[in-house]
């Protein structure tokens, strides 16, 4: 299946149903009074994270999602039916951005997590709500409010513990094939990975971590050159970055300069990403003897000003790979993710008598009190009756 990590969709919540103006008309009951019911609330639009999805390709074609409108109120005090909600399923790791405001509405990081992205409109009130001792036959009603409407930008960010960095042909795909069951394309000629891939590295029955392979970076990537910059966002949730350096580049380029390009592009893209823990890993040491590889790796590290530990591996022959993976596993165990739970303020519970409806009733009472020409002997059959219309 084609990998798609960005999509734009339109979500429209349902409008609230209108209130009803109706009077009880029954045999032998000459003054039945008002019996107009309220409308129904509009349906909401929700996003739900689903671990069975791994791409946003479904939303390249289906771009509009609309919830159902609430039904209008009816006579005999019948309340309109609430509109049905719409649930849009997205892959785990999807970030939701409101295109109108640029606000990040939420990150879908757990399976089953739900996020309301469009709230349905409030129901309108029927004329039964406006009856009083001085207004026995009210002809007022309120209209339902419109539902929310938003253009959303969906951005899929892969959830991985370890991210791979490096130039094209540094051996990232070969490494992920060596340590996991993932099978990205590899070959003995220059080319680059086109889409990100994930691999699960199982150290034993209880310990494992996820590694992400993204297309290689090239010089000028921060300005849009190549593919890598587009997929760098997938590394934002990684806990450690493995910077693979080809110790003997096939094109004869300088490994030191290649490493500096990667670090420079990383800093241009995001200071937060550049500040993540980064490990230096020299690959393809099987192309020379051990002493030569160690001497060359040490010289490159010194040229880069690298003072921490570095690793020598061969992803093709798996030399040093197991030691590296165990060190990564130990780092992940010793540095667990700290979930900072924000103090959530209690949500305002708004039922039938929310602020909107209360305001409508208060305005109606003011209109009745200010009406100097009120006729308490008004008859339902009077054709000259006045109907009140309220605008939101």
From Swiss-Prot:
Residue numbers binding Mg(2+): 173, 193
Binding locations of GTP: 166-173, 191-195, 213-216, 283-286, 314-316
GO MF entry, a single one: GTP binding
Ranges of Acidic residues composition bias in the record: 364-386
Compositionally biased spans, kind Polar residues: 129-143
Enzyme Commission number: 3.6.5.-
Record-given protein name: GTPase Obg
Description of how the protein assembles with itself and partners: Monomer.
Residues of the OBG-type G domain: 160-333
Origin: domain of life: Bacteria
Domain Obg: 1-159
Job description of the protein: An essential GTPase which binds GTP, GDP and possibly (p)ppGpp with moderate affinity, with high nucleotide exchange rates and a fairly low GTP hydrolysis rate. Plays a role in control of the cell cycle, stress response, ribosome biogenesis and in those bacteria that undergo differentiation, in morphogenesis control.
Listed GO CC annotations: cytoplasm
CDD domains xref list: Obg
Family (UniProt): Belongs to the TRAFAC class OBG-HflX-like GTPase superfamily. OBG GTPase family.
Provenance organism: Klebsiella pneumoniae (strain 342)
Positions of region (Disordered): 127-148, 364-392
Co-factor requirement: Mg(2+)
Primary location recorded for the protein, binned into one broad class: cytoplasm
Cell compartment(s), UniProt: Cytoplasm
């Amino acid at each position: 299946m084609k990998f798609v990590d960005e999509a734009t969709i339109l979500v429209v919540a349902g409008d609230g149903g209108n209130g009803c103006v109706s009077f009880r008309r029954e045999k032998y009951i000459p003054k039945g009074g008002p019996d107009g019911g309220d409308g129904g609330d509009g349906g909401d639009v929700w996003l739900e994270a689903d671990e069975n999805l791994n791409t946003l390709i479904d939303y390249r074609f289906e771009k509009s999602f609309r919830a159902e409108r609430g039904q209008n109120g009816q006579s005999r005090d019948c309340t309109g039916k609430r509109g049905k909600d719409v649930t849009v399923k997205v892959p785990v790791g999807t970030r939701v951005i409101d295109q109108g405001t640029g606000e990040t509405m939420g990150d879908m990081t757990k399976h089953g997590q739900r996020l309301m992205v469009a709230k349905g409109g409030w129901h309108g009130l029927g004329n039964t709500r406006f009856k009083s001792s001085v207004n026995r036959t009210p002809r007022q009603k309120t209209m339902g409010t419109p539902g929310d409407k938003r253009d959303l930008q969906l951005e899929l960010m892969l959830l991985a513990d370890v991210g791979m960095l490096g130039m094209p042909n540094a051996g990232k795909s070969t490494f992920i094939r060596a340590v996991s069951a993932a099978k990205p394309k590899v070959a003995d000629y220059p080319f680059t990975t086109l889409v990100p891939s994930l691999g699960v590295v199982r150290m034993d029955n209880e310990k494992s971590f996820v590694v992400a392979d993204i297309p290689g970076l090239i010089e000028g990537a921060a300005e849009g050159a190549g593919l890598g910059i587009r997929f760098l966002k997938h590394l934002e949730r990684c806990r450690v970055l493995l910077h693979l350096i080809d110790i003997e580049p096939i094109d004869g380029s300088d490994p030191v300069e290649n490493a500096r390009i990667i670090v420079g592009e990383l800093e241009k893209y995001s200071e937060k990403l550049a500040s993540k823990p980064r490990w230096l890993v020299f690959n393809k040491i099987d192309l020379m003897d051990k002493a030569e590889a160690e001497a060359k790796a040490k010289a490159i590290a010194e040229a880069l000003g690298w003072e921490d530990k570095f690793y020598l591996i061969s992803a093709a022959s798996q030399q040093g790979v197991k030691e590296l993976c165990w060190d990564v596993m130990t780092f992940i165990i010793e540095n667990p993710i700290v979930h900072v739970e924000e103090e959530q303020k209690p949500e305002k519970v708004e039922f039938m008598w929310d602020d909107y409806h209360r305001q409508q009733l208060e305005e109606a009472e003011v209109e009745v009190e200010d009406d100097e020409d009120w006729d308490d002997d008004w008859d339902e059959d009077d054709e000259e009756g006045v109907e009140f219309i309220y605008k939101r």
